[in-house]
């Protein structure tokens, strides 16, 4: 049974409080009641602290502009509050800074004494009431109010003890032990990621980067090479490669760009040079020139940012070798320069990924929830993909690439589409993408520019589900096979 319960903080707060009080009711001894009250209090204190610490990682919060950003959203926004903040930016900066300090320093309530603790709880409840009025988060008032009787109880108990600093010391020791275990798990996960699965191999490119690749190389007449999106690894192509594997006349290769998975950057170049999109293009060309067999017809497939890479690579591969490219919901080189919404979206992605990347690079990937798309992949790839998602390498590599996109594409005069006169082009777009006016326009423009003989809009598909949904991915694989077979017949 599916339910939306538990999808927000108020549900989670209520669950923690109700579960603990149920235990206290079932075992009504003084020690059990005391322990459950401490549990509720510490859950409440850490919920405020964690919220503040995560906000500190976000650039809009540090710049003091996050509140107006929230107020302009359709979900939690409030037109009057947004207009007020626009007229009084200094107030927004002060309010944002105050909120960050208040939440981040909340655990210090145990050092301040019961009177200060009561004032802090009163301030917290006032904050929740304000959120309820402005943002419509009425349930948060009652969900988080249930924490505060326990917090007040424990601050009084702590001040009454002779060893007043015993709890902070014990809590710090326990926290250090937990962090130690998490860091050991992170080191083990990093080793698994760097080793890569045993069914893949490594190849050193002309740039000195080492690419980890896999696939089927049996000397078929057509070779399909697949390029990943941003913040994505070759496991995303699992359903598509499963379909291609059943085609006798098609070989295929998937790989991870340098920095992702078990693929490694040239250490010397990484220290001295700034990443360019063309660096990945050169690696792809080097990979193809090494693994492509004489006489094979080549088809390149690129998803999202991978589409931009294969589009550039197509200009550098001999036309007698490259016979087709498949652009799957591909990046358009002008999409950020020609659309303010797309440019703003790119910045939001950069900010969001920076927050997550910082947490993961600090070794706390174990605390991240297993994403739904991992569960949609073929079973053999799920553990690999989950380890990569929780490891900092993927987030560091993605941040390096998204910064390059901002420098090279989000500019006044971005590069333009270039003709591929001897190469067939198939364009696949998700229906959700086509519903967006700007993104849909870009997909149509690419199809018209290349005169794409095969332009497909896949119904009930999103940008990600084109690869991760097995029912959708098999249709994408069909388009790839159609192009591969067409090029074979045209030989």
Residue ranges and their predicted role:
Residues 44-45, 49-102:
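Membrane-interfacial catalytic/cofactor-binding modules of polytopic membrane enzymes
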Residues 257-301, 317:
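Active-site loop/oxyanion-hole signature of alpha/beta-hydrolase fold enzymes
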Residues 386-449, 457:
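Conserved serine/cysteine hydrolase catalytic core
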Residues 448-491:
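Catalytic active-site module of serine/aspartate enzymes centered on a nucleophile-bearing elbow/loop
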Residues 216-264:
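Conserved HGGG/HGGXW glycine-rich cap/lid loop of the alpha/beta-hydrolase fold
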Residues 206-216:
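A short loop-to-beta-strand scaffold at the N-terminal edge of the catalytic core in hydrolase folds
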């Amino acid at each position: 049974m599916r339910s939306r319960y538990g999808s927000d903080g108020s549900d989670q707060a209520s669950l923690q409080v109700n579960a603990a009080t149920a235990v206290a009711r079932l075992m009504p001894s003084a020690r059990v009641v005391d322990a459950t009250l401490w549990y509720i209090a510490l859950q409440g204190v850490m919920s405020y602290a964690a919220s503040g610490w995560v906000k500190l990682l976000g650039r809009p919060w540090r710049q003091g502009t996050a509140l107006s950003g929230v107020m302009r959203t359709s979900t939690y926004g409030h037109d009057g509050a947004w207009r007020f903040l626009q007229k009084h930016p200094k107030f927004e900066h002060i309010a944002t800074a105050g909120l960050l300090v208040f939440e981040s320093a909340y655990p210090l309530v145990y050092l301040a004494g019961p009177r200060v603790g009561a004032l802090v709880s009163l301030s917290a409840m006032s904050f929740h009431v304000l959120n309820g009025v402005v943002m419509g988060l009425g349930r948060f008032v009652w969900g988080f109010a249930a924490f505060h009787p326990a917090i007040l109880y424990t601050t009084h108990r702590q001040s009454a003890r002779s060893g007043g600093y015993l709890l902070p010391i014990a809590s710090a020791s326990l926290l250090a032990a937990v962090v130690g275990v998490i860091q050991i798990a992170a080191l083990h996960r990093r080793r698994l990621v760097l080793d890569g699965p045993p069914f893949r191999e490594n190849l050193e490119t002309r740039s000195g980067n080492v690419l980890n690749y896999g696939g089927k190389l049996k000397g078929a007449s057509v070779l399909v090479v697949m390029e990943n999106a941003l913040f994505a690894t070759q496991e995303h192509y699992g359903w598509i490669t499963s379909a291609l594997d059943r085609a006798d006349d098609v070989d295929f290769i998937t790989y991870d760009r340098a920095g992702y998975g078990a693929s490694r950057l040239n250490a010397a170049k990484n220290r001295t040079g700034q990443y360019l999109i063309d660096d990945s293009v050169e690696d792809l060309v080097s990979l193809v020139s090494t693994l492509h067999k004489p006489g094979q017809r080549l088809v390149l497939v690129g998803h999202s940012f991978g589409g931009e890479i294969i589009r550039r690579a197509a200009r550098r591969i001999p036309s007698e070798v490259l016979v087709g490219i498949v652009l799957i919901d591909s990046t358009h080189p002008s999409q950020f320069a020609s659309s303010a919404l797309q440019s703003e979206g790119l910045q939001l992605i950069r900010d969001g990924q920076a927050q997550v990347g910082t947490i993961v690079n600090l070794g706390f990937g174990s605390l991240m929830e297993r994403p739904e798309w991992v569960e949609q992949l073929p079973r053999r790839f799920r553990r690999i993909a989950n380890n990569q998602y929780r490891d900092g390498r993927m987030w560091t590599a993605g941040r390096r690439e998204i910064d390059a996109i901002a420098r090279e594409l989000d500019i006044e005069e971005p590069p333009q589409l270039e003709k591929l006169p001897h190469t067939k082009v198939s364009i696949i777009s998700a229906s959700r993408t086509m519903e967006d006016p700007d993104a849909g326009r870009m997909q149509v423009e690419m199809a018209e520019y290349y005169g794409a003989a095969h332009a497909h809009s896949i119904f009930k598909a999103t940008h990600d589900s084109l690869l991760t949904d097995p029912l959708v991915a098999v249709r994408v694989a069909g388009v790839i096979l159609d192009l591969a077979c067409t090029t074979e017949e045209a030989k």
